[in-house]
């Protein structure tokens, strides 16, 4: 009876693994579809670059604007973009681990010297479990978010810098390079000093009304658009990471199925051989 029991156990494991591989394959296909849609949103890049050029040119003559001036840093803000779901490999852990050591290094400092803004349930859970100061969060965003979906948190984030809640703001997210490569990115968002350093005036425009009045409206909107752009980038990375993770899981499941099938065939062959041996032995005993 033992060989039969062993055969049943192996068969049960094969069936269970097949069901798992079907699930991971379906998730891989869904993520592939979502990634294809997310990649189409990359067409906004030329528009963003043109806006960036205009803002840089406008700001070049008005560097005294509060959003363009570095000030003594008493408090630093971290905007961390994660996902609402797991099963995406190291997508989330790579981002939060980049931020967490910074908090650890500043562990002796008062908590009010650090402020964390989180997009995504995974990051929110991570930071709250470690009693880190999360002052703003948003979860349950759609897989293809529109600007309206994050307009409120983007506006509040820029407003927190403007009213002095923190003196500088860094963004952390996964930058989409390709379907098989995503890079964890740290980018200083506010003040826009790095942005000014990267962009030099190349075209001369005439403004009506004044540049200062335009910047009062344009700079906050531009900072909000940078947050939205990072979110789109992160979403594409999330779908790519999940697609890759599910493909690897499916491949591993298929390897396990092949190994178990080989074990099943060997066990079945051994059981048949044993039965034949017992029959032959019984026949010889009767002679």
From Swiss-Prot:
Compartments, as annotated in UniProt: Cell membrane
UniProt similarity note: Belongs to the ATPase gamma chain family.
UniProt keyword Membrane, yes or no: yes
Taxonomic path: Bacteria, Bacillati, Bacillota, Bacilli, Bacillales
Membrane-crossing residue ranges in chain numbering: none
Protein name listed in UniProt: ATP synthase gamma chain
Stretches assigned to coiled coil: none
GO cellular component labels: plasma membrane; proton-transporting ATP synthase complex
Pfam families named among the record's database cross-references: ATP-synt (PF00231)
Gene of this entry: atpG
Subunit structure, as described in the record: F-type ATPases have 2 components, CF(1) - the catalytic core - and CF(0) - the membrane proton channel. CF(1) has five subunits: alpha(3), beta(3), gamma(1), delta(1), epsilon(1). CF(0) has three main subunits: a, b and c.
Predominant location category: membrane
Bilayer disposition of the protein: Peripheral membrane protein
Source species of the chain: Bacillus caldotenax
Domain of life, source organism: Bacteria
């Amino acid at each position: 009876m033992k060989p039969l029991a062993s055969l049943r156990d192996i068969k049960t494991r094969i069936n269970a693994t097949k069901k798992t591989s079907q699930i991971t394959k379906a998730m891989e296909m869904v993520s592939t579809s979502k990634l294809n849609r997310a990649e189409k949103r990359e067409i906004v890049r030329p528009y963003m670059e043109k806006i960036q050029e205009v803002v840089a040119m406008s700001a070049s003559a008005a560097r005294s604007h509060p959003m363009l001036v570095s000030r003594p840093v008493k408090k630093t803000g971290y905007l961390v973009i994660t996902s609402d779901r797991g099963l995406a490999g190291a997508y989330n852990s790579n981002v939060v681990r980049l931020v967490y050591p910074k908090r650890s290094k500043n562990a002796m400092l008062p908590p009010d010297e650090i402020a964390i803004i989180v997009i995504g349930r995974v990051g929110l859970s991570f930071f709250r479990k470690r009693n880190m100061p999360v002052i703003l969060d948003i979860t349950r965003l759609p897989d293809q978010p529109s600007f309206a979906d994050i307009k409120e948190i983007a506006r509040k984030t820029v407003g927190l810098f403007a009213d002095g809640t923190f003196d500088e703001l860094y963004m952390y997210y996964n930058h989409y390079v390709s379907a098989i490569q995503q890079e964890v990115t740290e980018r200083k968002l506010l003040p826009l000093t790095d942005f000014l350093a990267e962009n030099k005036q190349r075209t001369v425009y005439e403004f009506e009304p004044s540049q200062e009045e335009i910047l009062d409206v344009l700079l906050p909107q531009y900072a909000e658009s940078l947050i939205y752009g990072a979110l789109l980038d992160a979403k594409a990375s999330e779908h790519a990471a999940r697609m890759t993770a599910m493909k690897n899981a499916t491949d591993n499941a298929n390897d396990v199925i092949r190994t178990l099938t080989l074990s099943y065939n060997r066990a079945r062959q051994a059981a048949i051989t044993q039965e034949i041996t017992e029959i032959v032995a019984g026949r010889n005993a009767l002679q």
